[in-house]
Amino acid sequence: MSGQGKRLMVMAGGTGGHVFPGLAVAHHLMAQGWQVRWLGTADRMEADLVPKHGIEIDFIRISGLRGKGIKALIAAPLRIFNAWRQARAIMKAYKPDVVLGMGGYVSGPGGLAAWSLGIPVVLHEQNGIAGLTNKWLAKIATKVMQAFPGAFPNAEVVGNPVRIDVLALPLPQQRLAGREGPVRVLVVGGSQGARILNQTMPQVAAKLGDSVTIWHQSGKGSQQSVEQAYAEAGQPQHKVTEFIDDMAAAYAWADVVVCRSGALTVSEIAAAGLPALFVPFQHKDRQQYWNALPLEKAGAAKIIEQPQLSVDAVANTLAGWSRETLLTMAERARAASIPDATERVANEVSRAARA
């Protein structure tokens, strides 16, 4: 489907969970001849990341309202109005055929600006519980899609766009069937790390001994303390890194993942075809729990919520999974994934632009 001459504005910001799926769709449409610009905020990760992908970015000033004091709430309508005016001016100059909202604070004023100019608004919700911005925008959107069932009652479930290198991994049977030796446990706390996993996993390693080998992504500033914790637990042989640049290579190495359950992490693990032990971040709406639940229901993962998390709970779970069980879980994870999510979202963007 050629998009020659068509213009898209992607509205996404704040976290990798919003930005990376937006980039996947942007690249897919750019390969079809679309022009793409981005709407973001200057102080969040999109400001650096998006230009590195060859996409021009425009900025508006907006931030979240959750947890802010009474003065901030009183000033909020004016701030939202100013952000809407900025977004509207940007869109009048760029003249997109369609806008794609992937979440983050920037999507709110951006979506309202597009709607006020008669530009179709397409939304994608990455999480199992809809964010506040997308709940509002769903009322005016041309098309609403969701990665997991349940965020919106009637929205189409299309999965989360994930990185091409993850989708290109060999199937679980090819990767895992002949493996022997210690079970390879990949521990991922997200780019910020997860303190609870940094504290728990060295003790888990001590309990499991030679039956596992661990690659632990500690997050920024924690590598030394986590390495020390493994050493003090008598387990200095395990690998600790601050970041993992090549997640596809890490997934290819792993037999099982112990991690948080951010939307993109869950979708990548399913696409890679890996069993997982999820420890959802304790958010008041249990967003990460709902992200992980479909894989637990599919028999591909287990969820241990943070209040129930203990060294014994993790060690007993990992010890109870044989290699045969892990392979079965990996195949179920892959079967539950939606590998063409990027294409599905891109097709809806194209459809909205032609309508």
Curated annotation (Swiss-Prot):
CDD domains hit by this protein: GT28_MurG
Binding site for UDP-N-acetyl-alpha-D-glucosamine: T15, G16, G17, N127, R163, S191, I244, A263, L264, T265, V266, S267, E268, Q288
UniProt keywords, alphabetically: Cell cycle, Cell division, Cell inner membrane, Cell membrane, Cell shape, Cell wall biogenesis/degradation, Glycosyltransferase, Membrane, Peptidoglycan synthesis, Transferase
Subcellular location as annotated: Cell inner membrane
Reactions that this protein is recorded to catalyse: di-trans,octa-cis-undecaprenyl diphospho-N-acetyl-alpha-D-muramoyl-L-alanyl-D-glutamyl-meso-2,6-diaminopimeloyl-D-alanyl-D-alanine + UDP-N-acetyl-alpha-D-glucosamine = di-trans,octa-cis-undecaprenyl diphospho-[N-acetyl-alpha-D-glucosaminyl-(1->4)]-N-acetyl-alpha-D-muramoyl-L-alanyl-D-glutamyl-meso-2,6-diaminopimeloyl-D-alanyl-D-alanine + UDP + H(+)
GO process terms (BP): carbohydrate metabolic process; cell division; cell wall organization; lipid glycosylation; peptidoglycan biosynthetic process; regulation of cell shape
Family per similarity comment: Belongs to the glycosyltransferase 28 family. MurG subfamily.
Protein name stated in the entry: UDP-N-acetylglucosamine--N-acetylmuramyl-(pentapeptide) pyrophosphoryl-undecaprenol N-acetylglucosamine transferase
